[in-house]
Amino acid sequence: DSMLAQGGVCVLKDVNDFKCYFEDTMKAGHWENDPDSVRVMIESSQEVIGTLIDLGVDFDTDKDGKYDYTREGAHRRNRILHHKDETGKEITDTLLDIAKKKENITIVPKTTMIDFIEKDNVCQGIVCEDEYGEMGSILARDIILATGGLGGLFLNSTNYPHITGDSFALAIKHGVELKDINYIQIHPTTLYSKKKGRRFLISESVRGEGAILLNENGERFTDELQ
């Protein structure tokens, strides 16, 4: 679902903005965020963005050639670098193209993880199934689970239906400790449709630029940050 991200990526433009950036982030998380994690995210943002730019990610610039910063949701200042309205696709495509060229990376497409291969309480690989229903295995010394969230389990979601939290289920099955799985990010604004399936995402940038949520009577019905 990284491909679907529209708005952009936050970055600390200036050290003088740290306090405001930190407060905006904590407020948006109802002050339940891990403060240390928020600090690391903000402090490392310039380095991360710099790396993405060096790798070829094309963030939008203004007529003077300077980066064009926009604003999202709870941010009081413009801190968002973006690529048109498809920032996630730009970043994902760029990184994927690089990964495909790496000799030490093997990409196995259209393959689903079915289970862990466990021996003596150590994960040694995974059982997988390809698009033709053929079962196989992939062995590895270390396993990193990066299968995304579980938004596809919900009736109304901007996630694709196959985003079902498979890694969480397998982790629980094999006794792997999980943390904070009660925090599920649901994108709050989508284009209304009577059709079943994934909803079209309306970016937080819309609210960042001043849009508000109204009911059918044209009345505000919520504080977007509550």
Where are each of the predicted segments found?
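Residues forming the flavin
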Residues: D1-E23, T61-K63, K84-Q226
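Redox-cofactor-proximal catalytic regions of oxidoreductases
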Residues: D1-V57
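Gly-rich Lys/Arg/Thr-decorated short loops/hinges at beta-loop-alpha junctions or inter-strand turns
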Residues: Q6, E32, T70-R79, T147-G149
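Short coil/turn segments at secondary-structure junctions
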Residues: G29-D36, N78-H82, G151, L155, ...
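Short amphipathic alpha-helical patches
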Residues: E32-N33, V48-I49, H75-R76, S167, ...
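A conserved beta-strand/loop capping segment in the N-terminal third of enzymes
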Residues: R39-R77, I212
